[in-house]
Amino acid sequence: MNLIPTVIEQTNRGERAYDIYSRLLKDRIIMLGTAIDDNVANSIVAQLLFLQAEDPDKDISLYINSPGGSITAGMAIYDTMQYIKPNVSTICIGMAASMGAFLLAAGAKGKRFALPNSEVMIHQPLGGTRGQASDIEIHTRRILEMRETLNRILAERTGQPLEQIAKDTDRDNFMTAEKAREYGLIDKVIETTK
């Protein structure tokens, strides 16, 4: 059962109830707290575009706690983050794995963060296909091209050489927040806001 908390605010016109995500959106905060599929990507992209229309000069914060998911859905979010005018700050809470880690690294340089006990995991794209040999060959070429694209972007975002990215993403590569900072996936580990 998925319970979404409601927040009640007092206004000069009385009380107003929001689901917690709508209330956070008012403060330019977007939550990515699930696996990434087309529906999730469409929702995140719509929120990014809405916040750009509201104020193109004000930063957006994207909090990430995601095991990853669809490459094409994740790339829709990535491309939108790069396309819009506001800087998108990324913050890892819990786990940013696979496409979640990719989106974490996609935040504006200097504005990519992780909480101290969060984890980041990078790896090569996963895929599986069935069918005729020629179709399997087509899908194999496609996933290899995707791997090259993802590795190239990660190299640009982290400052790591492409060969190092290819080696480090060959298998599941788990990192603490501090290791992710050293690697260049994030810029800072947030200790406290107090």
Swiss-Prot record:
It catalyses: Hydrolysis of proteins to small peptides in the presence of ATP and magnesium. alpha-casein is the usual test substrate. In the absence of ATP, only oligopeptides shorter than five residues are hydrolyzed (such as succinyl-Leu-Tyr-|-NHMec, and Leu-Tyr-Leu-|-Tyr-Trp, in which cleavage of the -Tyr-|-Leu- and -Tyr-|-Trp bonds also occurs). Keywords: Cytoplasm, Hydrolase, Protease, Serine protease. It is an enzyme of class 3 (hydrolase). The keyword Protease applies. It comes from Halalkalibacterium halodurans (strain ATCC BAA-125 / DSM 18197 / FERM 7344 / JCM 9153 / C-125) (Bacillus halodurans). Its EC number is 3.4.21.92. This is ATP-dependent Clp protease proteolytic subunit 1. Disulfide bonds: none annotated. HAMAP family: ClpP (MF_00444). GO terms for biological process: protein quality control for misfolded or incompletely synthesized proteins. It is found in: Cytoplasm. Signal peptide: none annotated. Belongs to the peptidase S14 family.
